């Protein structure tokens, strides 16, 4: 069987390409396209032999797309027009132009691709752009299914709820297809023995867990999951939810994804400790959760991602209870006892499923690394969706053990 010829649009730092490798589907990326030169340097660092085009998508003609002769499209269009905290410009946002161009040329290709996978933020599912996407692929004869999924549903201690669409050019619907509904979990794939994701593994497992869950995005004022008192700006509901997350033994601990060695350069500076102590989302190495890491991580505090309490034995409740009565210098001294630090870029990459060999060029700054990772995706989530999408193609059927794709009886859906 000939390998799939894959076109990777908005390729970024190569998350889709890594997911394709992890899925073990026979495939070859014929071209990766992105306009971000910094992201392209990282992509080239990790995939030096892939044909990488550093140009706008709308600058590529229909004829040039036809010459690539691809039968799969992987894409993650710009999310800013659809973010819940943004302006939600949707189709009127200039950053949507390239995606609208894709939808325009798709029906006019000499040969339609057989497979499509798209990733975007939660919020895309209620956009006019999504409506045009569905209208276009239906007119082309694709069967499709939409999802809202988080890495926590794979046992990964990170919340990153994202919209996904998988589409296949065929007349028969997917076995798990729910027309007009968005699935909140993976179709169940039965495996012989689930495996855990480990940072030190040379190759990542194709399928991990058979008991799906869904974890909502964290709010911007979260705190530690095991606290029994409200010592920060959080609600009782937030505290209880975080405690429930940390009690879920099917989710791995953060320590499985952390770097060894000296990380003092990532300690929060005193002025940030003093100013934002009540807004920090603090987790420990033994925690089983973390907030979504955004492109502003390391530059902004509120809502950009969790910070790690490196001093595990320090009593965070006692320290926070003592703060109101202390002068600024003593507050800083108390908070410094927690050894609060940012997650390193490598640790965030680990949580997002990038393989151990993934790396950045030396000239890529820490700020750039955080920004690029914040704009990327979870490799494990996409790899599993690719396995579902291409079930029956090449090694994909072997990775599924040729088991049927079904949904649990308690499947969650969003109408």
UniProtKB/Swiss-Prot annotation:
- State the active site: 79
Which superkingdom is the protein from?
A: Eukaryota
Q: Which residues form a coiled coil?
A: none
Question: Where on this chain does S-adenosyl-L-methionine bind?
Answer: 13-15, 34, 57-58, 76, 376
Q: Name one GO molecular function term.
A: RNA binding
Domain SAM-dependent MTase C5-type stretches: 4-396
Q: Which reaction does it catalyse?
A: cytidine(38) in tRNA + S-adenosyl-L-methionine = 5-methylcytidine(38) in tRNA + S-adenosyl-L-homocysteine + H(+)
Alphabetic keyword roster? Cytoplasm, Methyltransferase, RNA-binding, S-adenosyl-L-methionine, Transferase, tRNA processing
Protein family (similarity comment)? Belongs to the class I-like SAM-binding methyltransferase superfamily. C5-methyltransferase family.
**PANTHER family named in the record:** TRNA (CYTOSINE(38)-C(5))-METHYLTRANSFERASE
Protein's name in the database: tRNA (cytosine(38)-C(5))-methyltransferase
């Amino acid at each position: 069987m000939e390998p799939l010829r894959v076109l990777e649009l908005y390729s970024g730092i190569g998350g889709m390409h890594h997911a394709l490798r992890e899925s073990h589907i026979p495939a070859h990326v014929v071209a990766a396209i992105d306009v971000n030169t910094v992201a392209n340097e990282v992509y080239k660092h990790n995939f030096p032999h892939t044909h990488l085009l550093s140009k706008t998508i709308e600058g590529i003609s229909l004829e040039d797309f036809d010459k690539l002769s691809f039968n799969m499209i992987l894409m993650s269009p710009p999310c800013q027009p659809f973010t819940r905290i943004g302006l939600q410009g949707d189709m009127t946002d200039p950053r949507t132009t390239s995606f609208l161009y894709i939808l325009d040329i798709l029906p006019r290709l000499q040969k339609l691709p057989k497979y499509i996978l798209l990733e975007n933020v939660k919020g895309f599912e209620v956009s006019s752009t999504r409506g045009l996407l569905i209208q276009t692929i239906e007119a082309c004869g694709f069967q499709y299914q939409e999802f809202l999924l988080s890495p926590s549903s794979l046992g990964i201690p990170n919340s990153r709820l994202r919209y996904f669409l998988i589409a296949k050019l065929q007349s028969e619907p997917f076995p798990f297809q729910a027309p007009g509904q968005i699935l909140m979990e993976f179709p169940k794939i039965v495996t012989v023995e689930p495996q855990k994701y480990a940072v030190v593994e040379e190759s990542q497992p194709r399928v991990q867990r058979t008991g799906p869950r869904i974890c909502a995005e964290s709010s911007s004022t979260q705190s530690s999951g095991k606290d029994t008192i409200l010592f920060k700006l959080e609600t009782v509901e937030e505290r209880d939810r975080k405690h429930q997350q940390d009690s879920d033994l099917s989710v791995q601990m953060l320590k499985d994804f952390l770097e060894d060695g000296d990380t003092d350069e990532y300690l929060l500076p005193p002025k940030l400790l003093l100013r934002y102590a009540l807004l920090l989302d603090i987790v420990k190495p033994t925690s089983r959760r973390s907030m979504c890491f955004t492109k502003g991580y390391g530059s902004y505090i509120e809502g950009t991602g969790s910070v790690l309490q490196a001093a595990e034995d320090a009593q965070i409740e006692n320290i926070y209870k003592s703060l109101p009565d202390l002068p600024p210098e003593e507050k800083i001294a108390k908070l410094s006892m927690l050894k609060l630090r940012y997650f390193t870029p490598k640790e965030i990459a680990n949580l997002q499923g990038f393989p151990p060999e993934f790396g950045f060029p030396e000239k890529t700054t820490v700020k750039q690394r955080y920004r690029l990772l914040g704009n990327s995706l979870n490799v494990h989530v996409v790899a599993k969706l690719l396995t579902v999408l291409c079930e029956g193609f090449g090694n994909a059927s072997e990775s599924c053990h040729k088991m049927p794709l079904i949904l649990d009886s308690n499947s969650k859906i969003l109408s």
